[in-house]
Curated annotation (Swiss-Prot):
Main location, first listed in the record: cytoplasm
Free-text comment on this protein's domains from its UniProt entry: IleRS has two distinct active sites: one for aminoacylation and one for editing. The misactivated valine is translocated from the active site to the editing site, which sterically excludes the correctly activated isoleucine. The single editing site contains two valyl binding pockets, one specific for each substrate (Val-AMP or Val-tRNA(Ile)).
Protein name per the record: Isoleucine--tRNA ligase
Motif 'KMSKS' region: where in chain: 595-599
Chain residues that bind ATP: K598
Family assignment from sequence similarity: Belongs to the class-I aminoacyl-tRNA synthetase family. IleS type 1 subfamily.
GO molecular function: aminoacyl-tRNA deacylase activity; ATP binding; isoleucine-tRNA ligase activity; tRNA binding
Top-level enzyme category: ligase
GO cellular component, one term: cytosol
Annotated motif 'HIGH' region, positions: 57-67
E.C. designation(s): 6.1.1.5
Entries under Pfam families matching the protein: Anticodon_1 (PF08264), tRNA-synt_1 (PF00133)
Binding residues annotated for L-isoleucyl-5'-AMP, in chain numbering: E554
Amino acid sequence: MKLKETLNLGQTAFPMRAGLPNKEPQWQEAWDQADIYKKRQALNEGKPAFHLHDGPPYANGNIHVGHALNKISKDIIVRSKSMSGFRAPYVPGWDTHGLPIEQVLAKKGVKRKEMDLAEYLEMCRDYALSQVDKQRDDFKRLGVSADWENPYITLTPDYEADQVRVFGAMADKGYIYRGAKPVYWSWSSESALAEAEIEYHDIDSTSLYYANKVKDGKGILDTDTYIVVWTTTPFTVTASRGLTVGPDMEYVVVAPVGSERKYLLAEVLVDSLAAKFGWENFEIVTHHTGKELNHIVTEHPWDTEVEELVILGDHVTTDSGTGIVHTAPGFGEDDYNVGIANGLDVVVTVDSRGLMMENAGPDFEGQFYDKVTPLVKEKLGDLLLASEVINHSYPFDWRTKKPIIWRAVPQWFASVSKFRQEILDEIEKTNFQPEWGKKRLYNMIRDRGDWVISRQRAWGVPLPIFYAEDGTAIMTKEVTDHVADLFAEYGSIVWWQRDAKDLLPAGYTHPGSPNGLFEKETDIMDVWFDSGSSWNGVMNARENLSYPADLYLEGSDQYRGWFNSSLITSVAVNGHAPYKAVLSQGFVLDGKGEKMSKSLGNTILPSDVEKQFGAEILRLWVTSVDSSNDVRISMDILKQTSEIYRKIRNTLRFLIANTSDFNPKQDAVAYENLGAVDRYMTIKFNQVVDTINKAYAAYDFMAIYKAVVNFVTVDLSAFYLDFAKDVVYIEAANSPERRRMQTVFYDILVKLTKLLTPILPHTAEEIWSYLEHEEEEFVQLAEMPVAQTFSGQEEILEEWSAFMTLRTQAQKALEEARNAKVIGKSLEAHLTIYASQEVKTLLTALNSDIALLMIVSQLTIADEADKPADSVSFEGVAFTVEHAEGEVCERSRRIDPTTRMRSYGVAVCDASAAIIEQYYPEAVAQGFEA
């Protein structure tokens, strides 16, 4: 027998190396086979419900790291709720209609206009479902637990039917109307866009300063006066029908020296504009307020048949331009609003493809709108005062990445203005995390226009609207309910397969169709109406769910997207928000804080992380960052995260190994019988349990990460486990000291594994498989630990906090002695503490082996007054460090005066000799092997 065999060296097959890329899929397969999701739901039957409603990602392509951040965050929340006394089902969803899928098919050579529409839509459907399958596998590979067999998909008949019912309810309340307002128009998509489909980029544009001649000055201005106008969209001059001034702004008429013309412009801009126009000297002739100029008539710069009326508008500023803006009601929201209010014609001179139309004039017809600036300048002639290139933020189609225009076209709208205040009131009642989200969404709703819900595309849910012979739009509840029933049975494809008459209720008549003829709408709904109806198609439709949801969690871009559209439809139909709380996350940037893009080559795919590190590292990274703001990721950052994971794993491995001979039912020691330091660690750990549980409830993942890492690295590795080895390895296997520590080890091991399960489910399950005394087959079926409190714990914590400070000071003294070559390892030390009465009282109160806690072989507590001149002091406490007296015990590795060679061939101290002689008589008789 060898001497080391008398030590209780922990034994475990739990591997030090995780091998996550290979093991994770094995655990996921085991979960699927055991149907863990359903088992967890069954365990929670009858408990309070918690419903996180999944915002549907778009079904196109593999997931990116932003998807991973979002889905992992949701999974952590749902898992923690499921283990904390809540019935928390999680139904994943997918958004499947819209232009991107049409674009994919177009790139594959599919020509929509050359094939049967039903066949084309079936191709769209098949592609979308293939992407759902692909992304489902991607999400499952992340370890996300969900009802994967019963997701919601926006193209399914039942969902489309529920979406139509939302539309029908809004129409029944008078919230749906048709109008020819200017909308965001994408010539590259040939469709209207919603605000959520817009992104902004900085571009260079040519701006023009030009003048309109006064035709009728209404006794205020002479006809030799010209009103100076500024525009950044020269093509819209073709449709200009008015000039807008600020009602309370001050204007002046100036006469440049040497010019026969006089010019009107904002007074505060005179000097800067004069310099721009090359007016070296000028005279101010008259002063006017904007109100005085109202209804003055001017000539269009080149179209002699058009008059442009001066009108008043509060949107005019002097931040740039001239203080006067030309007004084309067909090409801008502000222009439209003031134009309609003043009776201006709404003229549109650009077609759906961005080409100038016949009404723009023969010189412009057929040209692309963005290429006509030189021609506009030519047509302006000497009315053009200046031209310059400016850099400004401009809206782009988020899918095609092409610029868009405002363009008035007949569209269907949801009248947000009719119930705006109700929406704002609901926002006030909703909890937001971070808190600024409330103001952000509030301001968006307050300032937004009515919602353009029609799209001129094919792949989507048709607008369930019919037209009578006299043009009357029909969308009564009777009709929309019938269409919804048809969609539920056949899918929305039936809209394209049947004539209008066959889509209406049997025997339907309408006074506007005396001949019984009807037409059906060919536009589809905005895809944001699709996902924005999910509260009805999912939360309100499934028996195991409830509406409103407890939580919506998405990226901060969804304040103008899903958070927005869901809120509008829910308030419109039911008068309340679809959610009780909204949690938003920032974007994922690269390690330098730059936006990820394929062109920059700085993207990181979840699949790459899974292959190199494992999904657990990505999951741990999610908890390590403050996702309420933009977060950074890189392979270097993930490598650092994997190091933290390794520390956590190896600490838990140590606990597994050193409780391998511990049966909690037989060997556990009651709290009151634990050693002082063991009680301290029990109290300390329960504080961590409390912190983590509260952080889970607050969705504060970073607080969980910090609590776990600090406890594992500081409280366990750097303190408790550091000296505990000298007990659990060296003391007799069944000794009270060892069983006390094992009790604490096992308690921490089991509870910390449960606490980590929502974050590191694969690792937690692997650990659980080694805990043979636990009843649950899988840790996911266990319950979260509840923090305990103990009598007198505050006093105990205070005492140990003071000791930890003293221990830190002692470690500094030991380090100095090590540097001075007095000792090597701390176990070679004889440490003397020159203690005040206060420190002596503290050390006595701890009732502990202080030498053990300091990890020194010998310790002396001396009077503070006796400190020698060569002592070292830290924060008022003096220490001396000498080499310990005696020889090294071959078993405990401590230096001990009682160490001597024994008859059985080893040099050990009396304490080790007693253990050997009691428990290993055969070795005593035969001697130990070398």
